[in-house]
Design a protein with these regions (language model features):
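Single conserved hydrophobic/aromatic residue that forms the stacking wall/gate
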Residues: 1-13
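Structural and coupling elements of P-loop NTPases
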Residues: 12-549
């Protein structure tokens, strides 16, 4: 049976319902935020309510003995951050929930973008004191590319906060999405008294508690808006302000439109405090009702229905050495249709071969369990003998299905890398290629050069530290890294462009021509001016910020 350590089973041992019922109760979503907005805390509280963990632990690097359940790589434990995207499954209120947790620290990776390709919806966590921040904007753009529903949780209302009107206005202007407040905060910081639930027309009063942060219980009281005891409970001033706010919101004429939510045009907004648990469970309950079950997926020449009988899935993440003792490699796959059964034979479309997936796993940080079955919407880990790449399709034998490729996003930081010990070239090449195949870094080479030195590109600078750490600790290769003065890289999209045509391009002297591991040509630029020069002086030149795998 499919289950997680410490959680209820998502599939019972009793007589199984049909596939449709199992698929309909799946909810697969990603949580996105800027660093320190409270994403990890919210994730842990979800797991707490689902019974997947018994106590939520705050993560603050080495100073605390507990680590967040989604942080497992050694470098993550040292720094108290999520470098890789983790997958967690739990059961709550009849739903089987798959959370795709994404790095929330300042330097995230391309892996974060790809994780959003496996989600059916996203929860955007915003710090009430700071509003929309840089990383949120980047991740939001990827969600918009896919038209997936985006739900907003405005966190840290128990701390000094900006006006809720300002926050909603900023979300709409900065991100270009409509907002609909599902609840409304009463005060903030030390004056935070709770929220008004617009659908239930009731006030949920917040009662601060010193030691309640790690438990699932939360001290709160319910009041109707016309309860004579409410002004005394929250204070006359806040009561009058709340009445004015409710009147203003109801009179604004904005209707809640589920269709617009489902197409990523309107974001339901919830206010709360993840650290104190306040507003978390009501948010989870509402979110699960509003967010869709597994969505249809586009494949070449067709749309794949999640309720189709035949199994299909795609690889969206590869993680090597999850267990250092076994030097193993796990491919995370998102099941798109049908039912998966342990030991079933599937076709690896890109590899042109059939294979048995004999040890499928559900993962919860470092905990793993072999599973017997899984359904559309589920994320499972399968052993990768080194044959999978990001975006590969797995399907029922003979179906020749091929999902649309996952984009490779342009890195923003670049470093020239070589091994310090030339006798370890083999380990250097193996390690660099393996880490690149996982998608943690991208490797570029100058035209007609070997792997003696490579250009490593990353989305966030911490990935350089991760790369260096892993090369030294997992592959026993010390590397020398030299920062390069480039800020942009673009794929050349012109079909049939050969090396001779590449040499003839009119470019600035500081623009570098390179190729990726698939032999595709790219240009490295120092600034936007150099990009404009290339486009203006080379008629018909097509440059792209991402490339399909």
């Amino acid at each position: 049976p499919l289950r997680l350590v410490g959680s209820e089973m998502c599939i019972r041992d009793s007589i199984m319902p049909d596939n449709r019922a199992e698929i309909e109760k799946r909810r697969t979503f990603a949580i996105i935020s800027h660093p320190d907005a409270g994403k990890t805390t919210l994730t842990e509280k979800f797991l707490l309510y689902g019974g997947a963990i018994a106590l939520a632990g705050m993560v603050k690097g080495k100073r605390n003995s507990r680590h967040a359940v989604s942080d497992w790589m050694e470098i993550e434990k040292q720094r108290g951050i999520s470098v890789t995207s983790s997958v967690m499954q739990f059961q709550y209120d009849g739903f089987c929930i798959n959370i795709l947790d994404t790095p929330g620290h300042q330097d995230f990776s391309e892996d974060t973008y790809r994780t959003l390709m496996a989600a059916d919806s996203a929860v955007m966590v915003i710090d009430a004191g700071k509003g929309v921040e840089a990383q949120t904007r980047k991740l939001f753009k990827v969600c918009v590319l896919r038209d997936i529903p985006i739900f907003t949780f405005i966190n840290k209302m128990d701390r000094d906060s900006r006006s809720p009107y300002d926050l909603l206005d900023e979300i709409e202007k900065e991100l270009g999405i409509g907002t609909y407040p599902m609840n409304w905060p009463i005060g903030s910081g030390v004056d935070f008294k709770g929220v008004y639930d617009r659908e239930k027309d009731k006030v949920l009063r917040f009662i601060p508690e010193e030691s309640g942060a790690g438990r699932r219980e939360v001290q709160e009281q319910d009041f109707s808006l016309d309860d004579p005891a409410l002004p005394g409970a929250i204070g006359e001033y806040l009561y009058d302000a709340l009445k004015d706010d409710v009147e203003l919101l109801d009179g604004a004429g904005y209707e809640f439109d589920l269709e617009r939510v489902r197409h990523g045009k309107l974001s339901p907004v919830f206010f709360g405090s993840a650290l104190t648990n306040f507003g978390v469970e009501p948010f989870l309950e509402q979110f699960l009702k509003l967010t869709p079950p597994p969505l249809s997926r586009q494949a070449e020449g067709r749309t794949v229905d999640p309720f189709a009988e035949d199994f299909s899935a795609f690889v969206f993440k590869i993680q090597a050495n999850m267990n250092k003792a076994h030097r193993d490699r796990i491919a995370f796959i998102r099941i798109c249709s049908g039912k998966f059964e342990k030991g079933m034979e599937v076709e690896h479309v890109q590899g042109g071969r059939r294979m048995k997936l004999s040890q499928p796993q559900q993962l919860m940080a470092q905990s793993r369990e072999i599973i017997d079955e899984a359904y559309a919407g589920d994320i499972i880990g399968v052993f990768d003998p080194g044959v999978f790449s990001i975006g590969d399709t797995l399907c029922a034998p003979g179906k020749k299905l091929k999902f649309q490729g996952i984009p490779t996003f342009a890195p923003e930081l670049f470093s020239l890398v070589r091994q310090k010990d030339t006798m370890k070239r083999k380990q250097f090449v193996k390690g660099a290629n393996q880490i690149a195949q996982e998608g943690a870094i991208q490797i570029f080479q100058e035209i007609n050069s070997g792997m003696e030195e490579i250009i490593v590109g990353v989305v966030g600078s911490l990935q350089f530290d991760v790369f260096q750490y892993r090369m030294e600790n997992e592959y026993n290769v010390e590397v020398h890294m030299q920062t390069l003065p480039y800020s942009f890289i673009r794929w050349i999209d012109n079909e049939g462009l050969d090396e001779a045509a590449l040499r003839k391009l009119n470019l600035t002297s500081d623009t570098k021509k390179v190729q990726d591991l698939k032999g595709r040509y790219l240009l490295l630029f120092s600034n936007q001016w150099s990009i404009n020069w290339a486009l203006e002086r080379n008629e018909g030149l097509l440059l792209s910020e991402f490339s399909e795998n």
